[in-house]
From Swiss-Prot:
GO biological process, one term: 'de novo' UMP biosynthetic process
Annotated organism of origin: Saccharolobus solfataricus (strain ATCC 35092 / DSM 1617 / JCM 11322 / P2)
Binding site for orotate: T115, R143
Name by which UniProt lists this protein: Orotate phosphoribosyltransferase
Gene designation per UniProt: pyrE
Pathway in which this enzyme or protein is active: Pyrimidine metabolism; UMP biosynthesis via de novo pathway; UMP from orotate: step 1/2
Pfam families named among the record's database cross-references: Pribosyltran
Length: 195
C-alpha cells in the first residue's frame, strides 16, 4: 500500500467538502494528527530524519500540535535539542508561545501539513523575535497552495516528504475514488495548486 492509500485507508485524508482555515472550500481534508497511532508513521519518521540530516540547524522546533510528534522523533533519533511553538497564546500559565530558548540558534521548523504557509510564517516571526534564525521548514505534506512562495519571501525554504499533487495523482490512478470525487479534486487542483 502506498502512502496515498494509507492516508485514505486510515481516514487521514477525507473526501467531501471542507472549509479550510483560509476560508477556502476543499474537496479533501488532511488530518495527520492521528498518524502517530499507526505503524506507517515510522516510515514517515525515517524519511524525515534523512531530510533533516541534510538541513543545517542547531535545534528542532515542532509547530503545535501537528508538528510536535514528528519533531520529537527526529530530535531523539538525531540526539538534538527540541522544543515546540504554539501559534496562539494559551491565555493561562506563562502565556508563552515559544517553549525554549532559540537565541542565536538555527531552527528547523517541523509541521505536519503546509497549505498557505501562515502557521509556519507566524512561527518563523516568533522565533526571529526570540533571537533565533529560520532558513528551513520541514512538513510531511505540502498542499501546494502558496506556502513555499510565502516562506520564500522570509528566506525560508519549505521541504516536504510528499506534495499533494503526487498523493492525489496516485489516488486518481487507482479505483479508490468515485468519478465525481475525481472530478471535484481535479477541478480544485487546477484552480488552487501551484505549479
Amino acid at each position: 500500500m502506498n502512502f496515498a492509500e494509507v492516508l485514505l485507508e486510515r481516514k487521514l485524508l477525507l473526501i467531501g467538502s471542507f472549509v479550510l482555515t483560509s476560508g477556502k472550500v476543499s474537496p479533501y481534508y488532511l488530518d495527520l494528527r492521528p498518524l502517530p497511532n499507526y505503524p506507517e508513521f515510522y516510515d514517515i519518521v525515517n524519511q524525515a530524519i534523512k531530510k533533516a540530516k541534510d538541513i543545517p540547524h542547531d535545534i528542532i522546533v515542532g509547530i503545535a500540535t501537528g508538528g510536535v510528534p514528528l519533531s520529537a522523533f527526529i530530535a531523539c533519533n538525531l540526539k538534538e535539542p527540541m522544543g515546540y511553538i504554539r501559534i496562539e497564546k494559551k491565555g493561562h500559565g506563562t502565556n508563552r508561545t515559544l517553549e525554549l530558548d532559540v537565541k542565536g540558534k538555527r531552527v528547523l521548523l517541523v509541521d505536519d501539513v503546509a497549505t498557505t504557509g501562515v502557521s509556519i510564517e507566524k512561527a518563523t516571526l516568533e522565533i526571529l523575535n526570540g533571537g533565533g534564525k529560520v532558513s528551513d521548514a520541514l512538513v510531511i505534506i505540502d498542499r501546494q497552495e502558496g506556502a513555499s512562495q510565502r516562506l520564500e519571501k522570509l528566506g525560508v525554504k519549505l521541504h516536504s516528504l510528499f506534495k499533494i499533487s503526487e498523493i492525489l495523482d496516485e489516488l486518481l490512478k487507482s479505483d479508490k475514488l468515485k468519478d465525481n470525487e475525481k472530478k471535484s479534486i481535479l477541478d480544485y487542483l487546477v484552480k488552487n495548486v501551484e505549479k
